[in-house]
Structure formats: C-alpha cells, structure tokens
Amino acid sequence: MARYNPFSFTPGPVVFFTTVIYVGLFAALLVTHLTVPDYPSDPPAGINLTEAWADLEHITRRFHPYNSHANDHVREYLLSRIQGIVATKHLDGSQVEIIDDLTSNATFSSGATSVYFEGTNIIVAIRGSEDDEPFNSTDRRPNNGGVLVNAHYDSVSSGYGATDDGVGVVTVLQLLSYFTESHNWPKRTIILLLNNGEEDFLNGAKAFMRNPISRVPHTFVNLEGAGAGGRATLFRSTDTEVTRFYSKSKYPFGTVVSGDGFKKGLIRSETDYRVFHSDLGLRGLDIAFMEPRARYHTVEDSTRETSMNSLWHMLSAALASTSGLAAVTGEEFSGSESLDNGRVNAGRGSDGVWFDLFGRVFVVFQLHTLFALCVTLLVVAPITLIGLTFGLSKADKNYLLARKAFVYSSDDDNPVQLYGWRGFFRFPIIFISATAVVVALAYLLVRFNAFIIYSSPFAVWSMMLSAWFFVAWFFSRGADAMRPSALQRMYALIWLFIGSFVLLTIVTVFVNNYQVVAGYPALFYFAVVFVAIMLSYLELFFAPTKSAYARHFEHDANSRRNSDSASRPLTGSTTAARSDDRPVADDDATEITSLLRGDRRGFTRYGSRRDSASEGGEDQAQGSQRLDLGNVYPGEQEWSGKLPSWIWIIQLLLLAPLVIVLVGQVALLLTSALYQTPSDGNSPLFIYLAIAALSVLLLAPTGPFIHRFTYHVPTFLFLVCLGTVIYNLVAFPFSRDHRLKVYFVQRVNCETGANTVSLTGLDSYVQRIVGELPSAQDQPLNCTTPDVATRKELKTCEWEGLPAKVVPNAAGAAPFGNETNTGRWLEYSIHKGNRSNKATMLVVGLNTRACRIVFDSPISGLAVTGAVSDPRFKPVGAAGSREVRLWHREFGQPWNVGLTWDAEEHAKLSGRVVCLWSDANTGSIPAFDEVQHYLPVWAIPSKISDGLVEGFKRFEI
C-alpha cells in the first residue's frame, strides 16, 4: 500500500493549505486594518492620556470654526493649558517661548481666488539643547534646522472636530509636556504650532509663514483627521529620509499608495502638509485618520465615535517621529545654499517607497532602488527562463509544447505522443472568463444599486472574490476532468509570468517617468511568480528523457502487441504503464479541440513502419529499456510520474502570502479611502472596477492549483456569491451607521430679505430627504447641478427655508428674523478714484469675521489695508481673480479693499458682496437645526462651503 504524502499535489493537501493560507492572512489583514492597538496602562514619562482625553472632551463640546465665538473659547483654553504645562515645569523664556500670534496676516491667491487672512495661531518653541540662536532671528538660525509639529484647532461649522483635528491638538499638548521633561529634552529646536483656519483654505498655515519663527524648522510632522477614529495612517511623506523616522513608531500604519492618491487627485481634500512642503520648503510627514469618511465634517466627528486607543495611536506615531527628527544634529536636512525665494533650504531628499506589515513592521526604501530592482528583474527573469528552456532541451527533457517523440528518426510515421501542448491555453481562457464575470458584476451594481458600497464594502468584496474563484474553478476543474495535464500548473505559472511581466513593465515606466510608485506590489508579485515558474522548470529535470520514454513505450508496445486494450489513451488513469495505446500523430488534443472527440484509431497503424520493425527487429526490442515511471496522477501524462509531488507547496508559499499581504493591504486602504466618496460626487464605477481588479490580483495565485480543488469550497463560495449578489442588488445603500452625507447652505438676499435653503447630495436621495423637512413640504423644489466644480455628479435642491437669525439686536443681543433687518447684516461703500479702473471698497458684516467679494469679471489688482507684502505670495493670480475672501480676527470689523481691473475689456466692475455666518451653536440658524432634526436616520448634514449662511448684496462700479 502506498504511503500517504500530506504534501503531495492532490486535492486534500491543496484544498487544506490554500484555504488555511488565504483565510489566515485575510483575517490577519482585517484585524490589523479594523482594530486599534490598546493604549498602554503606563505611558512614557511626561505623557498623561487621561489628561489628553479630558482636553479633547473640552475642546469638542461645541462646533468651533474660525468664524465662531466658540473658536475664541477654545483658543483661550489652549493658551491656558500651554501656560499651565510650562509653569509646572518651572521653565523660563530662554528654554520655552510661547508666541500668542495676533499680528501675522497673509494675502495670497490660488487659481481665480484671492485671500486676505488674519491669523490667530498659537506657537510654542522648545529650544534644542544644541541650538543657541535666538528663536526669532531672521539671519541666525540653527544650521541643522528644527522640527515643526502642527495641528489646527478650528473645526468645520457642521462638526465637533474630535479627529479633525482635536486628537492632533491634544497630541501637541502632550508633546509639549513630554519634551519639557529634563530627560526628554530635544537636541534640536521643536516648534509646536496650533494653527487656526485650516478648514477654510489652509489659512492658518499661510499665516504661520509670515512669522519669522517659521524659518527655524526644516522638517515637520503634520497631524490631521479625515475620519472618526481607527488608526492614524501615514498619509504621505516628502522623502525617504524623513519617512525612516516614522518607521520607529511601535505601530506604523500606511502605504505610499495614499501619497500617490494625493498627487493624482484621487483624494480631493488637502492638509497643511501642502503649505509646509510646497510653499515653505520643509520636509516632513502627514499623519492622519482616514475613515469612516461618512462621519468626516459632521456631528459624528465627536469623542463618542473615537477612542483613547485612536488617540494613543496618533500620539505614539507623532512621538516617535518627532523624537527621531529632533535627535538629528547633522546636516541631513540643510541645503548648502540659502534660497532667495523665501523658502527654507531643507536639502533635497529622495523619493521613497514605504508600507507597513501588519501594523508592526515598516518597510522603507528609495524610489531609485525600486526602479533598479524592476529593471533588473525584467531583464534577468526572461534570460533565466530562456536558459532553463535551453538546458531542458539539451537534456532532452523539454516537454513544454512537445507534441511527440520519435523512437528511431523524425520521419517515423507513428511517433509517440507526449501531449505537451495540453493545457497551454487553458489558464488565459479561464482567467479572462472569471475576470469578465467580476467586471460584469461591477457594471451590474452601478446599474441597479450603485451606492451599496457606501454601507457594505465587505459584501461587495465577498461577492467579487467568491465570483472570481468559483468561475475560475468551474472552468479549470471541467477542463482538467476532460483533458488532464501534468503541465497545467506550469502553464498557468507561465501565463502569470507573462501577465506580471507586462504589469511590471507598466509600473516601471510610471516610476521612471512620473515618480508614481503605488504599483510597488507588482515588483514583489513578479518576483515570486518568477521564482515559482523557475521551480517548475527545474522540476522537469526529474522527468525521463523524451527518447528514453519513447524507447520505454516501444518496448512495452512490442511485449503487448496483441493485447485487446489497444484503444486506451496515453495518460495515466492508474500507475500501470499504458504504452501500448499510442494514439496516432493527429490525435494530439489542444484547448480548441472538441471535448467530445474520442481516441480515434485505425488499422493503418498496425501496418506502419514501426510495427514492421518491431515484429522483425529483435535487436531493437532487446535494446529498449523499461522505465520506472513512478506514480502518475490519474489521467495525466505518464512521463510525469517521476516529477516531485511536493514542489507545488513551495510555489504556493512563494506566491500566496506575499501577494495577499501586499495587495490586500493596498486593497483595504483604497477601500477605506474611496468607498464613501460617492457622496462627494465620485464615480462608484471606478470603485467597483478597482475592487474587481484587486480581487483578480489577490486570487490569481490560486490559478496554478485551483484544478485540484474538490467541489466543497467552490460550492460554499458559490452560495456566498449568490447571497451577496442578491443582497448588493436589493439592500438599501445607507444606514444609521453609514449615513449619506448631504451638504447644507442658506443664502439670503440682504436687499430683499428672500432666503433660499439648499441641500446638495446624490440624485433621487436628496429629493427624498428634502421631502421630509416640514419647511419644504408643499413647496416646489428646484433641483439643479451644483455650481461647485468638484460636486458635478450631485444635485442641489432649493426651497424657501426658515429665516436665519445670525445677527442679534444691538441692545438686547436677542436674535431677530431676516424678514425685517437683513439690510443691516452687511454694508459696503465704494470710493472710485480718478482712474476708471481703480476703486476702493469698504466692507463690513455684523457678527461675523468672514466676507467675500465675488466679481462678474476678473480683477487684476488687490490691496487690503493692513496687508503685508510677501514675495512668496501673489495677491492675484496670472489670470486675475473672480473672488476675494476676507478674514478678520475680530468680529464686525471692516475691510478696506483696493481693486484694479482691466477697463478696456470691462468698463464696469460688478458682482456681489457676501458675508458668512458659521456659528450653529446658538440656534441662530433654524434651517440647519431643522435639517439636523428631521433628516432620516440614514442621512447626515455637512457644510458645503466656509459659511452655513451667506448673505449678499449686489454692487456695480
């Protein structure tokens, strides 16, 4: 009785090991992605997590956007906390300096928008032990630079800002406490920045650039939030050298794919990272929360939805990164020359590739290393396989694509059939069929339930994965049952090699030409496929030579010439030899041969030259050899019996784990980043196609082994596929835990008192939502495409809403309705000089510190009284400005704005003066309160722009 081999290439081991590897690694990836490591019971000296959580609860009690009174209260609290921390450490001004910056302002432009902003930043400078220069010196600074740690303390008008950016703010407070401990004192100067105004246009970071201390740091750590809890990921990094310091974190998390997503605009939101790197010239990191996006900028961005574990995850990452950067005393982050464009010369880093492994290990290497490895593999791998093919041919063991072998000579009219072609085209046909099914499912979802991904991303993933696997198994198993082939595994690997070669070539081009490195998994994918196929080539050296096999066949044919079993095929349904059943030469089946064709034989073969020679040539028969062909898998070619039966498991261990980990990590990150972006106007089709493509990449390594699977696992997956298809097609796409985000704004004509409330959201759903609001009932809805460029896929529905009460009476400070007093909400006056293309406009809004001037035609010049010129900033862009945004640090203060325009093209300058109100804490915006109260449980409001209420008046010069 043959001994059972638990590692042989038979159904039992294949099903067991493949299932264990895939299920185990999928589970490990999901646990890493969906859970957060526990915070320590004994944190490092200087860190107090209980205190940090109390700070977070305090600053997130109310909405606190820049344009709100609650924002001032948060600022006062943070100043008092900073002063308290410094006081308890008994530090003087030479060691730690607190800068209450109420003087810096910035005037700049972006596209057709100009901004004048007055900052209210809080800056704390901890002098490094090896830095002696004064903090604010403009000509003497630390040669090796300092480290900037930034978070913004303003929230949006529709959210409490727990993770955006409350956790970042309390992290900065804890870093202040930590680094002012004597045993933790940094070698390099650390600048802690709590900036105000990030949510509105990255204004706070721009104002920081106007402070002389902004020239001290050369590196930075930016702390942000675009979700509500979970792990803080490394969103992006400027270079490899800086990223290595993040790798010291105990729980690193992230991949360079997110950085490329920012570069290519897949992630639309921006952070202060852009200002610090692109405008100021610093090198650093962007650490941020990223999901769930449905809670981003809503009331669910609160302490209830996050945790102390999440707080510790960001804090520990910031602590490790800052500690490492602050310990560098060399010239790594200093350029050799000073720059005359106002930027800091922080040296030049190298583009990098980085990713974590299960949230514990962080891999970092340079882009040029990736490129070199890609090119090397693309050259070495084909040459190696060509060499192995040549070696097999020299050894007479190249059964690949071999159709027949000759006993005597090539003109033998009845050669031995080898069936080397069998199975060659099988894998691409199966691969294309299975891939077509998952792509079709993507289009099916878009057609019938496009937004199910919003609440059920893992149902979509389960559908795609189970569909691809079942279809691939069905065709593979069917083909194997009809025409078994010992080369099916090897041919599948050859096709995987070809496909991954093409993929790596594309990735290499993008790496070299565009510095896009998100395709880094392709390098490892191709590498493991190359090693696996190389093992299959080496495996063939264990096969008998084709000539010896043919002689064995001839000897057996002579000995059993008169057997009655002359019609059996030349494959091993048992381990016994079947060499007497030689098919004729034209019986070599391929993938395009009919499956119903039998082994046709005629009497002519018995009159062939070989028969005559065998009957009369005793010498030849005596010279022939009988081979031990080993254990042939039932139905497969007899020459394969001596091939090692355990090579497959090495190939599986090469292919599956690395592909699952690297591709699976990218898949989870992209899912988290994109699955709730349709509410922002993103196309769901792109998301479904991305999931389909990643499903194929994840399961393609099963292709060489899938034909050995029994029906049990595929049947289970078929039922999973069937259930998830039905669910994904009929389930409602939103829920209490995954609310559809809709965008609110109220516009008031301050001249007529007319007000319009609008909600912007997904077509058909936003109409249902508005229909449930009492103020909108029995009113005709006007639903149009929004004028916001990034939300063209959405619909805006307008109706006459509840009057806003954003300006209190001067005497009793009681609110009043807009039907009588809106004319006083904002005032403007225009003074036109002697020149026809110049004018000065005085603008003031009551109970606000944010107004705008929107022009019907562009202006060419802008000068705001109190603004300071900065060569780094241009007040007006090259194509002019159509909008000027004005921000004051005090409520109700006027702006004096000088305007210049092209009088030849536009004799008159016209437009609107708009003032904004963003404070939803006091009940002064009843329409917003109504939306929050009456919205269905599956929807949630957010702000669409800087203000919740916009009051306007027309003007003409």
UniProtKB/Swiss-Prot annotation:
Binds 2 Zn(2+) ions per subunit. Zn(2+) 2 binds at residues 164, 199, 297. Keywords: Glycoprotein, Hydrolase, Membrane, Metal-binding, Metalloprotease, Protease, Transmembrane, Transmembrane helix, Vacuole, Zinc. Residues 559-586, 603-627 are annotated as: Disordered. Its cofactor is Zn(2+). Zn(2+) 1 binds at residues 152, 164, 224. The keyword Transmembrane applies. It comes from the Eukaryota. It is a multi-pass membrane protein. GO terms for cellular component: vacuolar membrane. Residues 32-369, 445-450, 512-521, 664-685, 735-957 are vacuolar. May be involved in vacuolar sorting and osmoregulation. This is Vacuolar membrane protease. It comes from Pyrenophora teres f. teres (strain 0-1). The lineage of its organism: Eukaryota, Fungi, Dikarya, Ascomycota, Pezizomycotina.
